[in-house]
Amino acid sequence: SAASDVYKRQDEHHFNEDLQWEDAVPMFERLQKLADKQDLEFGLKLSNTFPVDTTRGELPNEEMYMSGRSLFPLTIEMCNRISRQFGGKMRISFAGGADYFNCDKLFAAGIWPITVATTILKPGGYNRLHQMVEKVEDMPYRAFSGNDPAAISDLAASALHDFHHLKPIKPLPSRKSKEQVPLLDLSLIHIS
């Protein structure tokens, strides 16, 4: 998968310095009990970005952050583990590679809110927001009563082989132009 490509190496210290599963589960249980007692809602946001080593001079420093489609398999697997651990009762907000190709499946599995960033930073990105809304707007919305561990497990398993999350064998041509972008005076543009 894209997440395991050779150039996306991570150092164990990222895992060792982060919250460990055996500490996280009891903490989440305590926080959920406290939220229930206070008549509040509690949930987890997964996962934002993931630090990986810079190995090919992509950036001037030693680290960069994985996001977008390559992060999806890791994030959905964490959702899978949390959903199973808590019997589908833990609220999960998703921010780890959500896009047009999976937003409906995430929503149907009871994972929401769904936030996106990487997909809209690409060419045509804001048009994708419209496409994503169209894809989920007719789906039934229901108040949270749990997520679907089986559906999340299926998403996690399929993410490992879904071509949307795999690096192409033949690299795509660069979309970047070598031309200098012209200056544009927006005050001269008339919008009617």
Residue ranges and their predicted role:
Residues 109-131:
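Glycine-rich phosphate-binding active-site loops on the catalytic face of alpha/beta enzymes
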Residues 27-34, 67-88:
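Alpha-helix-loop-beta-strand connector modules within alpha/beta enzyme cores
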Residues 2-7, 191:
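Short, small-residue-biased leader/transition segments that mark boundaries at the very start
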